[in-house]
Amino acid sequence: MKIAVLSRNPRLYSTRRLVEAGTQRGHEVVVIDTLRAYMNIASHKPQIHYRGKPLEGFDAVIPRIGASVTFYGCAVLRQFEMMGVYPLNESVAIARSRDKLRSLQLLSRRGIGLPITGFAHSPDDIPDLIQMVNGAPLVIKVLEGTQGIGVVLCETTKAAESVIEAFMGLKQNIMVQEYIKEAGGADIRCFVVGDKVIASMKRQAKPGEFRSNLHRGGVASLIKITPEERMTAIRAAKVMGLSVAGVDILRSNHGPLVMEVNSSPGLEGIEVTTGKDVAGMIIEHLEKNSGPNQTRTKGKG
């Protein structure tokens, strides 16, 4: 197979590993800088050009699209789909998963466990919004944030009111969530490929911190997940329409709660922690499922 990897930086661990795994399995793997691919949206013959030449003959595309380039990255991926190239994750699913609020709305509709979450526009509604999520302590998240940036833990109602007011004053969209104290600053990253959790790790926040992101100094370790956690992760990825996803789960007193479904999960943490060949399993998934015009989008965008 000829596989395109959409990535801005070929030196990133995840990109390198995907190229390595694909090459080892006898495929031709080409890294394409997402922002240098440009499109000709012509009737009957959609094209993508890259550094002056048309891209042709690809069987599959692996999107590694950073949050900051979601809009353009999804447009490039959609163009690949229009050309009948099989995407590891579809453009609509990636766009959907990047919208934190929409993701939670979709997950809640399917009855997947979530922390109680509030969303409001007017400062007049702040007191009731805080009550809605069972009062302080609570967590405030900027909708566009990644890697734990723009996430605030408010210990008191007074602090929560001030922070929410400040964000609203800055015209920032935020959501307010109950704080799951019993999780103890830890979450579980379940790595879903197809309809299986192929690897999972526990991420523990460093002392005095509540965000367990590895980018924030969290520490990863091996963990055995429960059948309920496994099922929750698989269902969450399915609801989002993602073939490959990193599903972040909190252990609460009332079962597993999904924090986030990540459409471009990093490979380094999970491979180093578990010793599993996650990149190889992703390529294997492509081998089994890819084929011309296999996208569910069917060129309808």
Curated annotation (Swiss-Prot):
Q: What is its EC number?
A: 6.3.2.-
| Cofactor binding, per record | Binds 2 magnesium or manganese ions per subunit.
Q: Which residues bind ATP?
A: K141, E178, Y179, D187, R211, S212, N213
Q: Which PROSITE patterns match?
A: ATP_GRASP
Q: Name one GO molecular function term.
A: ribosomal S6-glutamic acid ligase activity
Keywords of this entry: ATP-binding, Ligase, Magnesium, Manganese, Metal-binding, Nucleotide-binding, Protein biosynthesis
Name all ATP-grasp domain ranges: 104-287
> Binding residues for Mg(2+) 2, per the UniProt record?
E260, N262
For this protein, the record's Pfam families field holds:
RimK, Rimk_N
Q: Which GO terms describe its cellular component?
A: cytoplasm
Metal-binding among keywords: yes
Provide the binding site for Mn(2+) 2: E260, N262
One GO biological process from the UniProt record? protein modification process
Query: For Mg(2+) 1, which residues are the binding ones?
Result: D248, E260
Record's keyword annotation contains Kinase: no
Residues engaged in binding Mn(2+) 1: D248, E260
- InterPro entries cross-referenced by the UniProt entry: ATP-grasp, ATP-grasp_RimK-type, ATP_grasp_subdomain_1, RimK, Rimk_N, Rp_bS6_RimK/Lys_biosynth_LsyX
**Which cofactors does it use?**
Mg(2+); Mn(2+)
Alphabetical list of PANTHER family matching this protein: RIBOSOMAL PROTEIN BS6--L-GLUTAMATE LIGASE (PTHR21621:SF7), RIBOSOMAL PROTEIN S6 MODIFICATION PROTEIN (PTHR21621)
- Family membership, please give it: Belongs to the RimK family.
Q: What is this protein called?
A: Probable alpha-L-glutamate ligase
The source organism is Pseudomonas entomophila (strain L48)
